[in-house]
C-alpha cells in the first residue's frame, strides 16, 4: 500500500545499518508446532518455535491445523487457534490438513475460506493421515470451485508399508533402514500419480518438501503439458545427504525424517531447480523432537523413531550462506 508520495519524514529513531544487508521479514510456509504426530508430541510449541524463528529474521510462519479422524474442520481450526493463544511472538497463519473426507467435511470448506483458510494439505502416506485417490480427486474439485490451493505430502504409503515389513523381517531395525523404506521412487510415483489426478481436475497444485531428482522430473513433465505446479523444498534436502544414516551410536536417528535425506545427485538437481525457477519456495518442515527422550524411543526399532528435524531458526542464514 502506498501511503504517501513525497519526501520521507524525519524519523523518531534511526538505526545505522551501514555495511549490513537489509531484508524484509522472512516467511516459513511449512512448520509443525505443538503437534501430536501419533507417535510423539513435537518438542516446540508456538511459544518456543516462534521465538526461534525471530532470532534469524523469520517474522511469519504458516503452520497446519491438522484434522483428527472423526473431527470437523471447524473444530480442528478452533483447536489449533487455541494452541497459539497468547504464545506467538511472530505473525502466523494456517493451512488446513484434511485427513478425512465426507459430505459434512465438504460442506465446511466454504466456512474455512470465510475463516481465512485458503490452502489445504493432504497426505499420501501415514495411516493416521492419508487419504485415498478418490478423496484426493474430490477435494481437488472442491478446492477448484473455492479458488483454494492444495499441497500434498507425496509418498506412496502402501509401498512404504511393504518395504517396512520386508526390512523388519530381515531384522533391519537401525536408522539406516528408514531411507531404505522410502527410496526415491516412493516419492516420484506419488508425485506422478497426484499430478495426473490434478490434471484430470485442471487445478493448480503444490508439492511440499520435494527431495528427489526423479520427483522434479515428474513435475517438469506435468508443466510441459500445461499444468500449474508450485514446488517447495527444504534446507535439509539441499545441505544434508544420506551419508548421515551411517553414523554410529544411534546418531543417525537425528536425521530420521520423511521424506528422508537423499543423494548428492538429488541435492544438485534441487539446487538447479531453484536456479532455474522450477522450485518456488524453501520452507523448513520444522518438526522438532528431543533426541534423548523422544528419538531414542526407536533405538531397537526404526519405525518407532519420531520423524522430523528442526530448522525454523537457521533457515535464513543457511540459505543465504550456501545459496547466494
Enumerate the predicted regions with their spans.
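Histidine-rich, glycine-flanked metal-binding segment
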Residues: 1-24
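Metal-associated gating/positioning segment near the N- to mid-region
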Residues: 17-87, 104
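Hydrophobic faces of well-ordered beta-strands that scaffold small-molecule active sites
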Residues: 25-31, 61-63, 92-96, 118-122, ...
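Glycine- and other small-residue-rich loops at beta-strand/loop junctions that grip anionic moieties
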Residues: 38, 128-131, 152, 183-187, ...
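Histidine/acidic-residue-rich, glycine-tolerant segments that coordinate divalent metal ions
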Residues: 67-78, 83-200, 214, 238-248
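His/Asp/Glu-enriched, well-ordered alpha-helical/loop segment
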Residues: 176-202, 254, 281-282, 288-324
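A conserved active-site cap/scaffold subdomain adjacent to cofactor or substrate pockets
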Residues: 193, 201-204, 214, 251-283
Amino acid at each position: 500500500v502506498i501511503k504517501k508520495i513525497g519526501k520521507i519524514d524525519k524519523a523518531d529513531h534511526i538505526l545505522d545499518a551501514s555495511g549490513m544487508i537489509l531484508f524484509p521479514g522472512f516467511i516459513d510456509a511449512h512448520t509443525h508446532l505443538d503437534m501430536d504426530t501419533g507417535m510423539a508430541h513435537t518438542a516446540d510449541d508456538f511459544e518456543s518455535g516462534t521465538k526461534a524463528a525471530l532470532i534469524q529474521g523469520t517474522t511469519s510462519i504458516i503452520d497446519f491445523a491438522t484434522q483428527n479422524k472423526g473431527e470437523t474442520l471447524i473444530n480442528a481450526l478452533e483447536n489449533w487457534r487455541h494452541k497459539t493463544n497468547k504464545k506467538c511472538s511472530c505473525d502466523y497463519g494456517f493451512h488446513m490438513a484434511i485427513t478425512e473426507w465426507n459430505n459434512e467435511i465438504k460442506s465446511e470448506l466454504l466456512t474455512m475460506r470465510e475463516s481465512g483458510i485458503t490452502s489445504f494439505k493432504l497426505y499420501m502416506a501415514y495411516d493416521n493421515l492419508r487419504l485415498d485417490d478418490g478423496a484426493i480427486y474430490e477435494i481437488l474439485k472442491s478446492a477448484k470451485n473455492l479458488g483454494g490451493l492444495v499441497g500434498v505430502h507425496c509418498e506412496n504409503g502402501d509401498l512404504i508399508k511393504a518395504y517396512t515389513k520386508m526390512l523388519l523381517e530381515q531384522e533391519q531395525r537401525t536408522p539406516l533402514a528408514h531411507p531404505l523404506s522410502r527410496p526415491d521412487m516412493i516419492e516420484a510415483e506419488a508425485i506422478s500419480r497426484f499430478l495426473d489426478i490434478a490434471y484430470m481436475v485442471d487445478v493448480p497444485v503444490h508439492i511440499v518438501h520435494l527431495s528427489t531428482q526423479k520427483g522434479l522430473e515428474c513435475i517438469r513433465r506435468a508443466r510441459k503439458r500445461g499444468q500449474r505446479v508450485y514446488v517447495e523444498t527444504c534446507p535439509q534436502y539441499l545441505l544434508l545427504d544420506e551419508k548421515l544414516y551411517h553414523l554410529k551410536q544411534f546418531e543417525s536417528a537425528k536425521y530420521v525424517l520423511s521424506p528422508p535425506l537423499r543423494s548428492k545427485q538429488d541435492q544438485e538437481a534441487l539446487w538447479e531447480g531453484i536456479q532455474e525457477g522450477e522450485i518456488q519456495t524453501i520452507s523448513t518442515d520444522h518438526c522438532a523432537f528431543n533426541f534423548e527422550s523422544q528419538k531414542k524411543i526407536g533405538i531397537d526399532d526404526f519405525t518407532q523413531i519420531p520423524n522430523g528435524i528442526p530448522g525454523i531458526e537457521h533457515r535464513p542464514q543457511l540459505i543465504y550462506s550456501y545459496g547466494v
